[in-house]
Protein backbone atom coordinates (compact mmCIF):
# COMPACT_ATOMS: atom_id res chain seq x y z
CA UNK A 1 0.00 0.00 0.00
CA UNK A 2 1.24 3.48 -0.83
CA UNK A 3 2.36 5.14 2.41
CA UNK A 4 1.59 8.63 1.09
CA UNK A 5 -2.07 7.75 0.55
CA UNK A 6 -2.32 6.66 4.18
CA UNK A 7 -0.35 9.48 5.77
CA UNK A 8 -2.35 12.37 4.23
CA UNK A 9 -5.79 11.42 5.66
CA UNK A 10 -4.17 10.52 8.99
CA UNK A 11 -2.42 13.90 9.11
CA UNK A 12 -5.62 15.77 8.22
CA UNK A 13 -7.63 13.92 10.85
CA UNK A 14 -4.98 14.52 13.50
CA UNK A 15 -4.77 18.23 12.75
CA UNK A 16 -8.55 18.59 12.66
CA UNK A 17 -9.00 16.69 15.93
CA UNK A 18 -6.31 18.74 17.67
CA UNK A 19 -7.96 21.92 16.37
CA UNK A 20 -11.31 20.82 17.79
CA UNK A 21 -9.83 20.16 21.24
CA UNK A 22 -8.02 23.49 21.19
CA UNK A 23 -11.06 25.45 20.04
CA UNK A 24 -13.40 23.78 22.53
CA UNK A 25 -10.97 24.55 25.36
CA UNK A 26 -10.84 28.19 24.32
CA UNK A 27 -14.65 28.36 24.53
CA UNK A 28 -15.49 31.19 22.14
CA UNK A 29 -12.05 32.59 21.28
CA UNK A 30 -10.15 30.64 18.65
CA UNK A 31 -6.43 31.27 18.25
CA UNK A 32 -4.93 29.41 15.28
CA UNK A 33 -1.42 27.97 15.44
CA UNK A 34 1.18 30.09 13.71
CA UNK A 35 2.47 29.09 10.32
CA UNK A 36 6.11 28.26 9.86
CA UNK A 37 7.06 31.82 9.10
CA UNK A 38 4.64 33.34 11.63
CA UNK A 39 2.24 34.98 9.17
CA UNK A 40 1.33 35.25 5.55
CA UNK A 41 4.18 36.43 3.36
CA UNK A 42 4.01 40.06 2.29
CA UNK A 43 2.97 40.90 -1.25
CA UNK A 44 5.64 42.48 -3.43
CA UNK A 45 3.30 44.74 -5.35
CA UNK A 46 0.31 45.48 -3.15
CA UNK A 47 0.02 46.21 0.52
CA UNK A 48 -1.16 43.52 2.92
CA UNK A 49 -4.57 44.18 4.40
CA UNK A 50 -4.40 45.19 8.07
CA UNK A 51 -5.47 42.52 10.49
CA UNK A 52 -9.22 42.54 11.05
CA UNK A 53 -10.56 43.89 14.29
CA UNK A 54 -13.52 42.46 16.11
CA UNK A 55 -16.67 44.44 15.45
CA UNK A 56 -19.47 44.91 17.99
CA UNK A 57 -21.82 41.98 18.37
CA UNK A 58 -24.46 42.10 15.68
CA UNK A 59 -28.18 41.44 16.08
CA UNK A 60 -29.38 37.94 15.23
CA UNK A 61 -31.76 39.28 12.59
CA UNK A 62 -30.92 38.33 9.01
CA UNK A 63 -30.08 41.70 7.53
CA UNK A 64 -28.38 43.72 4.84
CA UNK A 65 -28.33 47.46 5.37
CA UNK A 66 -29.30 49.70 2.45
CA UNK A 67 -29.31 53.46 2.84
CA UNK A 68 -31.19 54.30 -0.35
CA UNK A 69 -34.78 53.85 -1.52
CA UNK A 70 -33.86 51.82 -4.60
CA UNK A 71 -33.29 48.16 -3.74
CA UNK A 72 -31.24 46.19 -6.28
CA UNK A 73 -31.07 42.40 -6.56
CA UNK A 74 -28.65 40.33 -8.61
CA UNK A 75 -30.56 37.18 -9.60
CA UNK A 76 -29.78 33.98 -11.44
CA UNK A 77 -32.37 31.73 -13.11
CA UNK A 78 -31.49 28.05 -13.49
CA UNK A 79 -33.17 24.94 -14.81
CA UNK A 80 -33.63 22.81 -11.73
CA UNK A 81 -32.87 19.50 -13.46
CA UNK A 82 -29.77 20.50 -15.40
CA UNK A 83 -28.45 23.52 -13.49
CA UNK A 84 -28.18 25.43 -16.75
CA UNK A 85 -28.57 29.20 -16.67
CA UNK A 86 -31.63 30.63 -18.39
CA UNK A 87 -31.27 33.83 -20.42
CA UNK A 88 -33.43 36.17 -22.46
CA UNK A 89 -36.07 36.67 -19.79
CA UNK A 90 -38.09 39.89 -19.48
CA UNK A 91 -39.14 42.01 -16.55
CA UNK A 92 -42.67 40.67 -16.90
CA UNK A 93 -41.39 37.13 -16.35
CA UNK A 94 -40.68 37.82 -12.68
CA UNK A 95 -42.80 38.40 -9.60
CA UNK A 96 -41.25 40.09 -6.56
CA UNK A 97 -42.54 40.44 -3.02
CA UNK A 98 -41.29 42.12 0.13
CA UNK A 99 -42.66 40.80 3.42
CA UNK A 100 -45.42 39.14 1.41
CA UNK A 101 -46.45 42.34 -0.39
CA UNK A 102 -45.98 42.36 -4.17
CA UNK A 103 -43.58 45.00 -5.48
CA UNK A 104 -43.26 46.69 -8.87
CA UNK A 105 -39.98 46.03 -10.67
CA UNK A 106 -38.76 49.41 -11.94
CA UNK A 107 -35.23 48.52 -13.08
CA UNK A 108 -34.31 45.43 -15.07
CA UNK A 109 -31.40 44.26 -17.18
CA UNK A 110 -29.06 41.39 -18.00
CA UNK A 111 -25.29 41.48 -18.51
CA UNK A 112 -25.50 45.28 -18.54
CA UNK A 113 -23.34 46.10 -15.53
CA UNK A 114 -19.61 45.45 -15.19
CA UNK A 115 -18.26 42.75 -12.89
CA UNK A 116 -15.81 43.14 -10.03
CA UNK A 117 -14.37 39.66 -9.41
CA UNK A 118 -12.14 38.79 -6.46
CA UNK A 119 -10.41 35.40 -6.57
CA UNK A 120 -9.91 34.35 -2.93
CA UNK A 121 -7.33 31.54 -2.92
CA UNK A 122 -6.78 29.18 0.02
CA UNK A 123 -3.12 28.56 0.92
CA UNK A 124 -3.59 26.54 4.14
CA UNK A 125 -4.47 23.01 5.18
CA UNK A 126 -3.34 19.55 4.16
CA UNK A 127 -3.89 20.02 0.43
CA UNK A 128 -2.95 22.81 -1.95
CA UNK A 129 -5.95 23.56 -4.21
CA UNK A 130 -3.88 25.88 -6.40
CA UNK A 131 -2.29 23.65 -9.04
CA UNK A 132 -0.96 24.66 -12.45
CA UNK A 133 -4.30 23.58 -13.92
CA UNK A 134 -6.17 25.84 -11.51
CA UNK A 135 -3.82 28.72 -12.35
CA UNK A 136 -4.50 28.19 -16.05
CA UNK A 137 -8.27 28.06 -15.46
CA UNK A 138 -8.28 31.29 -13.45
CA UNK A 139 -6.29 33.06 -16.15
CA UNK A 140 -8.55 31.78 -18.92
CA UNK A 141 -11.68 32.82 -17.03
CA UNK A 142 -10.21 36.30 -16.50
CA UNK A 143 -9.55 36.55 -20.24
CA UNK A 144 -13.21 35.80 -20.91
CA UNK A 145 -14.33 38.82 -18.93
CA UNK A 146 -15.28 42.05 -20.66
CA UNK A 147 -12.92 45.04 -20.95
CA UNK A 148 -14.88 47.01 -18.33
CA UNK A 149 -14.74 44.16 -15.81
CA UNK A 150 -12.00 44.05 -13.18
CA UNK A 151 -10.20 41.26 -11.32
CA UNK A 152 -8.34 41.13 -8.00
CA UNK A 153 -6.42 38.36 -6.22
CA UNK A 154 -6.35 37.66 -2.49
CA UNK A 155 -4.77 34.74 -0.62
CA UNK A 156 -5.53 33.43 2.85
CA UNK A 157 -4.73 30.88 5.51
CA UNK A 158 -4.08 32.13 9.09
CA UNK A 159 -3.95 35.65 7.64
CA UNK A 160 -5.11 37.32 4.46
CA UNK A 161 -2.97 39.00 1.83
CA UNK A 162 -4.09 41.24 -0.99
CA UNK A 163 -1.88 40.05 -3.85
CA UNK A 164 -3.27 42.11 -6.72
CA UNK A 165 -5.65 45.04 -6.47
CA UNK A 166 -8.53 45.36 -8.91
CA UNK A 167 -7.16 45.62 -12.41
CA UNK A 168 -8.16 45.21 -16.03
CA UNK A 169 -4.55 44.50 -17.01
CA UNK A 170 -3.94 40.84 -17.92
CA UNK A 171 -0.21 41.13 -17.23
CA UNK A 172 -0.87 42.17 -13.63
CA UNK A 173 -3.18 39.19 -13.17
CA UNK A 174 -0.51 36.83 -14.51
CA UNK A 175 2.09 38.42 -12.25
CA UNK A 176 -0.19 38.02 -9.24
CA UNK A 177 -0.85 34.35 -9.98
CA UNK A 178 2.91 33.80 -10.26
CA UNK A 179 3.55 35.41 -6.86
CA UNK A 180 0.95 33.90 -4.57
CA UNK A 181 2.14 33.10 -1.02
CA UNK A 182 3.40 29.53 -0.69
CA UNK A 183 1.09 26.80 0.53
CA UNK A 184 1.49 26.09 4.28
CA UNK A 185 0.11 22.70 5.34
CA UNK A 186 0.42 23.69 9.02
CA UNK A 187 -1.79 26.75 8.58
CA UNK A 188 -5.57 26.92 8.89
CA UNK A 189 -8.44 27.65 6.49
CA UNK A 190 -9.50 30.83 8.32
CA UNK A 191 -12.72 31.52 6.41
CA UNK A 192 -13.99 34.06 8.94
CA UNK A 193 -10.95 36.31 8.50
CA UNK A 194 -10.84 35.76 4.74
CA UNK A 195 -14.52 36.60 4.22
CA UNK A 196 -14.33 39.66 6.46
CA UNK A 197 -11.25 41.11 4.75
CA UNK A 198 -12.61 40.24 1.30
CA UNK A 199 -15.85 42.07 2.10
CA UNK A 200 -13.99 45.15 3.30
CA UNK A 201 -11.93 45.15 0.11
CA UNK A 202 -15.01 44.71 -2.09
CA UNK A 203 -16.43 47.93 -0.69
CA UNK A 204 -13.60 49.68 -2.56
CA UNK A 205 -14.31 48.00 -5.90
CA UNK A 206 -13.79 50.20 -8.94
CA UNK A 207 -17.28 49.30 -10.14
CA UNK A 208 -19.34 50.43 -7.13
CA UNK A 209 -22.57 50.08 -9.08
CA UNK A 210 -21.53 46.84 -10.75
CA UNK A 211 -21.84 43.27 -9.67
CA UNK A 212 -19.41 42.14 -7.00
CA UNK A 213 -18.37 38.49 -6.94
CA UNK A 214 -16.02 36.63 -4.60
CA UNK A 215 -14.82 33.30 -6.03
CA UNK A 216 -13.21 31.12 -3.35
CA UNK A 217 -10.70 28.47 -4.48
CA UNK A 218 -10.35 25.92 -1.67
CA UNK A 219 -10.37 22.23 -0.79
CA UNK A 220 -12.88 22.45 2.10
CA UNK A 221 -16.26 24.10 2.61
CA UNK A 222 -16.30 24.51 6.40
CA UNK A 223 -13.75 25.37 9.07
CA UNK A 224 -13.57 26.60 12.64
CA UNK A 225 -13.49 30.37 13.18
CA UNK A 226 -10.00 31.65 13.89
CA UNK A 227 -9.11 34.71 15.96
CA UNK A 228 -10.46 38.04 14.73
CA UNK A 229 -13.99 38.79 13.54
CA UNK A 230 -16.51 36.07 14.27
CA UNK A 231 -18.11 34.12 11.47
CA UNK A 232 -21.29 36.11 12.08
CA UNK A 233 -19.39 39.38 11.67
CA UNK A 234 -17.77 38.09 8.48
CA UNK A 235 -21.14 37.00 7.14
CA UNK A 236 -22.65 40.40 7.89
CA UNK A 237 -19.74 42.15 6.19
CA UNK A 238 -20.23 40.02 3.06
CA UNK A 239 -23.96 40.73 2.94
CA UNK A 240 -23.53 44.46 3.46
CA UNK A 241 -20.83 44.65 0.78
CA UNK A 242 -23.38 43.49 -1.80
CA UNK A 243 -21.13 40.59 -2.85
CA UNK A 244 -22.15 37.24 -4.28
CA UNK A 245 -20.02 34.39 -2.92
CA UNK A 246 -19.13 31.47 -5.20
CA UNK A 247 -16.71 28.59 -4.79
CA UNK A 248 -14.56 26.36 -6.98
CA UNK A 249 -13.32 23.12 -5.41
CA UNK A 250 -10.75 21.03 -7.36
CA UNK A 251 -11.90 17.47 -6.65
CA UNK A 252 -9.56 14.62 -5.70
CA UNK A 253 -9.49 11.66 -3.33
CA UNK A 254 -7.46 13.60 -0.79
CA UNK A 255 -9.72 16.64 -1.12
CA UNK A 256 -12.85 14.60 -0.46
CA UNK A 257 -11.18 13.09 2.60
CA UNK A 258 -10.09 16.45 4.04
CA UNK A 259 -13.41 18.14 3.30
CA UNK A 260 -15.39 15.23 4.77
CA UNK A 261 -13.29 15.23 7.92
CA UNK A 262 -13.77 18.97 8.39
CA UNK A 263 -17.53 18.76 7.89
CA UNK A 264 -17.68 16.05 10.55
CA UNK A 265 -15.39 17.78 13.01
CA UNK A 266 -17.06 21.19 12.68
CA UNK A 267 -20.41 19.48 13.12
CA UNK A 268 -19.19 17.92 16.37
CA UNK A 269 -17.72 21.27 17.38
CA UNK A 270 -21.09 22.90 16.85
CA UNK A 271 -22.53 20.69 19.58
CA UNK A 272 -20.02 22.31 21.93
CA UNK A 273 -20.87 25.78 20.58
CA UNK A 274 -17.53 26.11 18.82
CA UNK A 275 -18.13 28.54 15.97
CA UNK A 276 -17.33 27.77 12.37
CA UNK A 277 -17.88 29.28 8.92
CA UNK A 278 -19.42 27.49 5.96
CA UNK A 279 -18.81 28.34 2.31
CA UNK A 280 -21.91 26.53 1.05
CA UNK A 281 -24.21 28.39 3.43
CA UNK A 282 -22.78 31.79 2.52
CA UNK A 283 -23.06 31.03 -1.20
CA UNK A 284 -26.69 30.00 -0.74
CA UNK A 285 -27.48 33.12 1.25
CA UNK A 286 -25.93 35.50 -1.27
CA UNK A 287 -27.34 33.77 -4.35
CA UNK A 288 -24.02 32.23 -5.39
CA UNK A 289 -23.00 28.65 -6.10
CA UNK A 290 -20.21 26.21 -5.28
CA UNK A 291 -18.93 24.04 -8.14
CA UNK A 292 -16.74 20.96 -7.80
CA UNK A 293 -14.87 19.11 -10.53
CA UNK A 294 -11.66 17.29 -11.34
CA UNK A 295 -8.64 19.51 -12.10
CA UNK A 296 -8.67 18.35 -15.75
CA UNK A 297 -12.20 19.74 -16.14
CA UNK A 298 -11.73 23.07 -14.36
CA UNK A 299 -11.49 25.11 -17.56
CA UNK A 300 -15.05 24.03 -18.30
CA UNK A 301 -16.12 24.60 -14.67
CA UNK A 302 -14.75 28.14 -14.56
CA UNK A 303 -16.32 28.83 -17.94
CA UNK A 304 -19.69 27.65 -16.60
CA UNK A 305 -19.38 29.91 -13.57
CA UNK A 306 -18.48 32.99 -15.63
CA UNK A 307 -21.36 32.14 -17.96
CA UNK A 308 -23.73 31.98 -15.01
CA UNK A 309 -22.50 35.35 -13.78
CA UNK A 310 -23.04 36.80 -17.24
CA UNK A 311 -26.64 35.60 -17.38
CA UNK A 312 -27.60 37.06 -14.01
CA UNK A 313 -30.40 39.60 -14.02
CA UNK A 314 -30.32 42.98 -12.29
CA UNK A 315 -33.69 43.63 -10.66
CA UNK A 316 -34.48 46.94 -8.94
CA UNK A 317 -37.51 48.26 -7.11
CA UNK A 318 -38.63 50.97 -4.70
CA UNK A 319 -40.36 49.48 -1.69
CA UNK A 320 -44.03 50.23 -1.04
CA UNK A 321 -43.02 50.51 2.61
CA UNK A 322 -41.60 54.04 2.88
CA UNK A 323 -40.36 53.71 6.46
CA UNK A 324 -36.65 54.02 7.13
CA UNK A 325 -36.86 52.20 10.44
CA UNK A 326 -33.96 49.77 10.30
CA UNK A 327 -36.34 46.83 10.04
CA UNK A 328 -35.58 43.59 8.23
CA UNK A 329 -37.42 43.14 4.93
CA UNK A 330 -37.76 39.61 3.58
CA UNK A 331 -37.52 39.33 -0.21
CA UNK A 332 -38.83 36.65 -2.53
CA UNK A 333 -38.19 36.66 -6.27
CA UNK A 334 -39.80 34.02 -8.51
CA UNK A 335 -40.63 33.51 -12.15
CA UNK A 336 -44.31 33.85 -13.02
CA UNK A 337 -46.31 30.59 -12.69
CA UNK A 338 -47.07 30.46 -16.42
CA UNK A 339 -43.37 29.78 -17.17
CA UNK A 340 -43.13 26.83 -14.82
CA UNK A 341 -43.37 23.51 -16.64
CA UNK A 342 -43.77 20.14 -14.86
CA UNK A 343 -40.71 18.71 -16.62
CA UNK A 344 -38.62 21.90 -16.62
CA UNK A 345 -38.96 23.82 -13.38
CA UNK A 346 -37.05 27.10 -13.05
CA UNK A 347 -35.44 28.27 -9.82
CA UNK A 348 -34.22 31.75 -8.90
CA UNK A 349 -31.08 32.31 -6.83
CA UNK A 350 -30.74 35.72 -5.18
CA UNK A 351 -30.23 37.22 -1.76
CA UNK A 352 -32.95 36.71 0.77
CA UNK A 353 -33.54 40.12 2.28
CA UNK A 354 -32.23 43.50 3.40
CA UNK A 355 -32.58 46.07 6.15
CA UNK A 356 -34.22 49.40 5.41
CA UNK A 357 -31.52 51.83 6.48
CA UNK A 358 -32.45 54.49 8.99
CA UNK A 359 -32.40 58.09 7.83
CA UNK A 360 -29.39 59.95 9.11
CA UNK A 361 -30.05 62.86 11.42
CA UNK A 362 -27.85 65.90 11.89
CA UNK A 363 -27.31 67.83 15.07
Language model segments and positions:
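Bacterial N-terminal signal peptides that target proteins for export
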Residues: 1-13
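Bacterial N-terminal signal peptides
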Residues: 10-22
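Scaffold/interface architecture of coatomer-like assemblies
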Residues: 25-363
